[in-house]
Amino acid sequence: MIQNEINLSFKMLKYLKFIPVNVPKLYSNEKKNISECLKTNWISSEGKFVKEFENNFSKFNERKYGIAVSSGTAALEVAIKSLNLKKNSEVIIPAFSIISTALCVIKCGLKPILIDCNIFTWNVDSEEIIKKINKKTSAIILTHIYGLPVNLSNILKIAKKNKIKIIEDAAEVIGLKYKNKMCGSFGDLSTFSFYAN
């Protein structure tokens, strides 16, 4: 019976229309800038456009500094390492997030503590975070999901009181605000990504 259902599913695939996650839009300015990179031979991470992007993106997100890296995963790893968290300490992370969040925590010699999400927003449940904070907690990674900011107010107060670092993963809320302040401007560090989602 199951094999028949699988065969039927594969036959139906030809009738489904592919819907891309994102379709890039390139205008004349982008083409001109790419041409300039090729002409000047600056196609690595040190060209003028990278510095310009870092400065403009930092200002846009109400941050003093910004460093471009190759991916959101790389950004998370750099953020975690730069905080010099105590080895084997705990980092609270959302259970509903890209696997990179947990992998970066583990790779940095820390223990991920998974927190379930709020059933209405899919964001990490702030009340559950508060319950899991203990003496071993060194950081909290707050991942904003599907364009909805995490309910930050209580978490930020408790983190400050307990000297817990906050990393904001703001990949899915670029340009959005929480209480009239840019998402990605609340944490000790914030990460962003331009993955197609």
Identify the meaning behind each predicted range:
Residues 46-90, 104-108, 114-116, 181:
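Phosphate-binding glycine-rich loop
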Residues 81-161, 165-170, 177:
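PLP-dependent aminotransferase-like
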Residues 168-197:
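Conserved active-site segment immediately N-terminal to the catalytic lysine
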Residues 1-43:
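N-terminal "arm"/small-domain region of PLP-dependent enzymes with the aminotransferase-like
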Residues 20-22, 70, 141-143, 191-195:
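Short beta-strand segments
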Residues 23, 131, 181-183:
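Short secondary-structure boundary/capping segments
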